Amino acid sequence: GLLFLSSILESVRTGIGASILGLSLLFLAYKKGRAVPAVMLLIALFVGSVFFVKPVKDKMFGKQAETVTISNVGKAKIETSGREYMWKRIMNHCYNPNPTFGSGCGGALGWLKDINSKGGLVLIHSDWVQMMSESGNIGLCLYILFAVFMLFKVLAITWRYRNNKMLTLLGGTTVGAFAACFFCMGFDNVITYAQQGYVLPFMLFGIFLKTIDLTENGEFEEEIIP
């Protein structure tokens, strides 16, 4: 809750979206169908923060923020703070010449720093764009397969122990952390500049697996969900 509130107060759109997604998956994994009201409340909070918290609305829609309402939001253009322009330039220079293999590890970031040697945009602000431009379709597809595998792996293990309260909570937390991390990677450089955020889901996954071992060995008392 405090993380979500801090994201709103600081007008961090990526943080708001990641919090909503992560908490929603946590509730759904932990409470199953009973989590639907909580998820709906989170969605309502997201919509409310976008339309009724002025700093968030200004950052989301830029100069047109005053004219954007719920009824005409479909026609509004979301402000990307220069990201869209930068991504197009990177894709044209580093991806389009060789879509299969990309420009090579470090190629896109190195090129961006070279053309902005006097300051300006020096971060790609998207791990997904960076992977696609530097590793091409092959590298991106391999990572997407890894991301999907990790999510389904944790979900499958969580479902197997769905009657255990502690394991279900840990599994839901791990799923939410992975989903939030992969979401943030779309709009920021999590892997290269916020490595703590990237490592956290894997730490939770390790704790989750170790807790399963301890539970099966009888070192933790199994608390059954009624």
Which positions does each model-derived feature cover?
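Hydrophobic alpha-helical segments of polytopic membrane proteins
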Residues: 1-56
